[in-house]
Amino acid sequence: LVARTMTQAERWLERHHDEQFFLYVDTWDPHEPWDAPDYYTAAYREGYAGEQIYPAYGNYKQAGLHRDDVDLGHATYCGEVTMVDFWIGRLLAKLDALGLRENTLVFFTSDHGFYFGEHDYFGKAEWVHDAWAIVAEGSRMPSWLPESWLLTVGWSPLYGEITRIPLMVRGLGLEPGRRTALTTVPDLTPTILELAGIEAPASVQGDSFFGVLTGERDEQRSFVVSSWPLYFAEGEITLAVDSRPRHISSYMPLTVSTRDRSLILGGPDDEPEFYDLVGVPGEQDNIWESQTREGLKLARQALSFLEEQGTPQEHVRPRRMSLERFAAGNARGNSDRTERPQQWVDKEAG
């Protein structure tokens, strides 16, 4: 798909290169299925001629897969990424050939990452499957994957492997280098508009990180919020992916990230997960019970941010209920506050 998409993008540029333009190109790849030609994947799994491995979309061990299955999937994914890299290079070369390098801004980013065994996940979400599903002959892709409405969407935490995405910017006057400021996808639009000399409409959310790109400042945000749609709640039905109805079996969590901490908030029955990204990298050691006060502070900031963006209370309330419940046994143990935890959260979370 990426080959056809980039070829069409090149042709579009040939027709419109002498005009002012905004071109958005969605490669789709490296989305699964990872079926790049063998010459792309050979560097990562030389000589493999077996079946294609499809993500388990959940705990790969519980799905009956082994570590080598995940590694095979990762190899074909890497082949897909290499293919995408080649075709993006073609598009950039076309810009150069048309004389557009010096007056064209290029932004490269993605929507999310993928789990390849981290936290025992293989996929990007927890899909709770029909226990009686039959595996399709000659493939590890279950036959119900494209067919069964019995599929349900379960608890799917957004760890760093999902939330950290690439962002590369090329443009006239921007010096090569790396930036470590925290940004989020809504910041892209106002940044592009500012770089193009266009005033952002009042309806545009997000904040421009133009100053970060030019080196005028080092910071953008103190924290960022990543989430599934907050209306993905227990008992709801989603038609996402292919318009087939699928049940949602739990509140979909959101993740609050700073430079050195991450916090995962779910529904009323879900205990928060709080991680020290510096002391124990990889989000493996939940410190919520020992650092509840710090976790609550970050949670209050995140919930206030959601409210400022106009998030309906019906979507904020379940997260606050989780804090009220799971702070009860911990907040006084690691803080000098004396109020009841529920009062504390209600008062300071807005």
Where are these regions (language model features)?
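Catalytic domains that recognize anionic headgroups
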Residues: 1-350
